């Protein structure tokens, strides 16, 4: 496995690739499993939830998403996993149905690290895609991180950046500056 360079929205050459309409993946593809492994390693190293192939310079219809595991603290102070991480590989995904109703979400992107803005997303979507074995799937998600991540990653495959979805650019902000501006607790 290898960590790949993530292309940036604010780099002119990278942006050309990020704005491309991606070509479909022809399955089977014996190199795809290694690419997917590299994508997961890259996404995890960048602390992301999703990554599309064009974000690492490969303009094909492939994206990955991993919903983080959930944990609970027990009465004795120990922590236990209550929901495992959910990894998804979506090949040639297409959103085939959507709610028609939007919700505003605070959203960021690994191609513009540290920046977030309010993005309108459908309250539910149905997506059709293939897995690594070429099997076709249909998945509906409503009002959760996976549903919003699907919309974000499919946008990447269509050359649409999250910054283009923001209706009020005053909501676009650099959270690293916000984080750096917070006072440091100096208690002993």
Curated annotation (Swiss-Prot):
Reaction(s) catalysed by this chain's protein: N-terminal N-formyl-L-methionyl-[peptide] + H2O = N-terminal L-methionyl-[peptide] + formate
Protein name, entry field: Peptide deformylase
Intrachain S-S bonds: none
Enzyme Commission number(s) of this protein: 3.5.1.88
Keywords for the protein's UniProt record, in alphabetical order: Hydrolase, Iron, Metal-binding, Protein biosynthesis
Molecular functions per Gene Ontology: metal ion binding; peptide deformylase activity
Top-level enzyme category: hydrolase
InterPro entries found in the cross-reference section: Peptide_deformylase, Peptide_deformylase_sf
Organism: Chloroflexus aurantiacus (strain ATCC 29366 / DSM 635 / J-10-fl)
